[in-house]
């Protein structure tokens, strides 16, 4: 029903000229949205891991009664039954890194690696700050973004999401991903920031390499 309502809206597609990774694509989106007029924007990415229409319905229902909340973050781990169909090893690894994230960064999200969220226009302006644009362009970006964003939050709400294995094989490397996450969290603990791997992570927003099709 919610998706049918959205069908009447104008849809813009941003087609990147190359693969910038999830972090790079987020940064391009942040810059694109800065001149747009809206109250909130929603990020959905799934590969069949959850019911997107149910997520939208929940967000619209909750937001209609709460106007002072800047950030709504979905969590796989608020209720045990929400991750029953999720890979057991990945679930254990997630719980380990969630606890480690709290210890190293003081970020108290129950699922800091989650990238299904709704954010207000007011709060999203901070996403153009250097501490976000200098984050990695790779798959760790949502986790790092949530950690850095946490300190800006006055009011936020976590919403449970029913999560399962998707219909597309995970692209995450089971060895390098946790190792790099561990190194970055330790770096944050002692230096107060994540590792800046190289200059290419920070986009020149005046020279973005993408085609926008409305």
Predicted regions, residues:
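Acidic donor-binding segment of Leloir-type glycosyltransferases
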Residues: 1-14
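Aromatic/hydrophobic pocket-lining residues that form π-stacking "cages" and hydrophobic walls in ligand
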Residues: 3, 58, 145
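Short, well-ordered coil/turn elements that cap or connect secondary structure elements
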Residues: 5-8, 35, 66-67, 151-153
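Hydrophobic helical membrane-anchoring modules
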Residues: 7, 130-214
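Conserved beta-strand segments of alpha/beta enzyme cores
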Residues: 10-12, 108, 155-157
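Acceptor/aglycone-binding surface of glycosyltransferases and processive sugar-polymer synthases
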Residues: 16-35, 40, 52-135, 139, ...
